[in-house]
Amino acid sequence: MTSIYHILDRIPAIYKQDMEIEYEYLAMQLIKSGKLRIDTNDCCNFARFTDPALNINLMISKEELTKPHLIPETTKLFQSLYKNSASDQKINSIFDNLKKQIQKLQPVKKEVTEMLARLFVQSAHPIVIRWLLLNKTEVFLTYSHNIGDMMDIVSWQRVGGNSGMQSTNGKDVAIFVSCGGNPFAENNKEHPSYGDGFAAVARLQIIAAQELGHFADIKRDDKGRQLTRHAANFSGTKATDKVRIARKSDIIHCNNLFNKLLNAGMKKQLEYETKLKFYNTNKINGVKVNAIKCMILIYKFRLLNYSSKNNLIFIRKFKTYKYMALMLEAMFKDMQDNLSPNAEVYKNKNPEIEEAIACIEALARVPQQTIKWGYLTTKETMHHLYKIYYNEVIPSLITSYNSFTGENYKRNLKKPKSSFFSKINIFSNKKLILKPVREL
């Protein structure tokens, strides 16, 4: 079973009037920072700068080369790369060459940039995005299926096949996210679970949520300096006891809960739904198919009744799916997969290091699973890790943010006031309505 990347608990906003005020502010700040690098296959907003002699490989956005408020910082960056030995003529030459690169590229439309920024910032708690902006973190978004197109050749050979990556070494921080398609194109009618449309929207947010989860995991002091991680030590060689125990408990709890539901009648419901799905796919009808539908309704009622008696409220969220039991099964397998990451990149001959990597990954995937399946489902299936992330990791970021900035941060859930006509999309500038995919 591979992780699911095409389902979201909520349809994210892509227009200003639908955004929470705080998220809209953060999206615009991300654009203003010049740190958002976008590659839509045919459009691009950044240029590549390399100097093999000094092993320099980096990307510079159009904004960093042209916006008056960013040019001094970009100049300072190049001066530091050359250890203040580069002449003004050398710096000007670098700027000119990069601008020529940019001019050859098809520019990313302002509307597309804004919508992508909105999708990205909604992938995490606002305090995570605030730290991302404070740290001047580079964000790379690509429509490709992997991040290789946005990296230098050395990095590409090492990790270019990944779908997302968050690199942190205390100095150079960058977040890479692949969409696997155009988020603003029509859904793929034959295969709606991948490619263009909502599948790309979901993939962007799910991968971003995980990478931002890694970013959030870093503990910072009152001056914003990175200290260690919540999940493990900074080198990722030893898990913290709290996260190690929480992960093991959640693995057991998730498996036990799934088995309880199977024994409560979901196993038979799965059998009937599997048959019905086969008949529907092959467009077969008849008395037998109708009988199967009746049996599914009976077992569905039993499962919902069992969930009510046992206070498993999250199960009710699945009752609207075409194949409820199949979706529940997929969710549990997805949770198990994310609690115990099994890819080759997470393997290590040292069991302690392998466990530390698993703990780092599992904690970072709490916000990913929350954005995918919803907080009720994630809180129930990843109970202990969920508590650590939202009761410790996020408050820790708020505390250090307040100390570092002198502010008193409070989450703002308000949305801009909207008229009746804008709510029903009449006389509005909305051109696109996201159509969620609710099937496996």
Swiss-Prot record:
Source organism, top-level taxon: Bacteria
InterPro entries attached to this UniProt entry: Uncharacterised_RC0048 (IPR020183)
Name by which UniProt lists this protein: Uncharacterized protein RP034
Record organism: Rickettsia prowazekii (strain Madrid E)
